[in-house]
Amino acid sequence: MNIIETTNEAMTSEPTPIVRSYSGRKEITTINLNVTQNTDGEYQCQTLSISHDGRLSASDIIKIISGKGLFGHIGVAFLKCLVSLFAIPDYDTLAAVLVSGRYTYPEELSCHRKALLGDMQPLTELNAYVEQCKVLAAQCFDNADTPNNENKNENENE
């Protein structure tokens, strides 16, 4: 897998968050993050170009972004594109995909085991990251799909 990171400046139209193209047996995935518009109406963004054999999954893309230290630059437009391209069905699935960008299931279990043995720091870090992922995922789906708002909606019906 070959990954090239660049900063694009002075684009006249807003870049598409995720672009996939194919050449022979290779997939080239271009990810545009941190899109901003200047006063002249031109766009700037961080771009990751990934060339690889086969196809990347949504989790693979999030892992690459996290590995490059760009997780904080993920925005709603990017997530909506990810949801559309990979047919992510709901809030819970998207939140899980986002969490998997940084933690594997065994790593999550390890955080819980350490907490049981008295070391709360890894679990505190995991929980903070999960909350961040939940907030991002909630931006792509109706508020009624999020766990915090389910209880609020049930109480309104009473």
Where are these regions (language model features)?
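A preference for well-ordered globular domain cores
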Residues: M1-E158
